Amino acid sequence: MSKELVFGHQNPDTDAIVAAKAFSYYENKMGADTEAVALGEPNEETQFVLDYFDEPALRVITKASDEVDSVMLVDHNEPQQSVSDIADVTVSHVVDHHRIAGFDTAQPLFYRAEPLGCCSTVIYKLFKENDIEIPAKLAGLMLSAIISDTLLLKSPTTTETDVAVVKDLAKIADIDYETYGLAMLKAGTNLDSKTEKELIDADAKSFEMAGKTVRVAQINTVDLDDVFKRQAALEAAAKDENASDGYDLFLILATNILDSNSELLVVGNPTEPVEKAFGKTIANNRLSLPGVVSRKKQVVPQLTDAFNA
């Protein structure tokens, strides 16, 4: 049996890191030979989680084909979000909770995707279905991933399953998930120590929409003014990436995790689909999006529909 690498998407968030750890553990218990790796360094929120549970960071890779022939993907499937040489390896497994786009394989594979708030919730179900015990430390990590993806169960992506899984994992990990969760989310909102490029790269994904490449970055904060006092510099950083990386449109979704409201900063063209998607007019390159916290559920589908209209 050949070794396989397990990894989440580029610019990994907490779920991308934890899901890789959890699914690798699960697969090894099922008899596979896997190693969890990452496509980037952990962000501040994820580092808080790793430190809290005394868990090492994953080894970071930029290529997979020089190590293995096959890989397992978690928390993503779109090739532009994956490892740079994804076309040169066989994808044997995918566990995800996102849309399927631009994904095809030459061989049959294991594919498990569910419309849940977090990939780690899907992986929890695999553990339960196969009677594999979740260790306390791993339960804490998986709990953290769900809190991160669902903004402490407040995001509209949250399902009843996510809520039930959080409560069960909290029991296994012996942790007060509400107190811990708020501290964890706040750990990821320290913006002053980061450059504008770091802010827009930390949690960003690319999407193909009607022939246009749209980059959507999300910045979590406890005060939107902390983001927009740097608007000019953020716009400049986004313009630089549009030019260097071939993005047509760069959207920066600044989200207040305390009151569940967002502001969208729009850099590039076309802007008409953005206005159509949200039924609003862009002013000073910005749109107010009250009640919007989820890129996956409240931004990308609306943009995709508007671009395809």
From Swiss-Prot:
It catalyses: diphosphate + H2O = 2 phosphate + H(+). Keywords: Cytoplasm, Hydrolase, Manganese, Metal-binding. Its main location: cytoplasm. One of its GO terms (molecular function) is inorganic diphosphate phosphatase activity. Disulfide bonds: none annotated. Its EC number is 3.6.1.1. Its cofactor is Mn(2+). The keyword Manganese applies. Gene3D superfamilies: DHHA2 domain, inorganic pyrophosphatase (n-terminal core). Coiled coil: none annotated. InterPro entries: DDH_dom, DHH_sf, DHHA2, DHHA2_dom_sf, Mn-dep_inorganic_PyrPase. Mn(2+) 1 binds at residues 9, 13, 75. Mn(2+) 2 binds at residues 15, 75, 97, 149. Belongs to the PPase class C family. This is Probable manganese-dependent inorganic pyrophosphatase. The lineage of its organism: Bacteria, Bacillati, Bacillota, Bacilli, Lactobacillales.
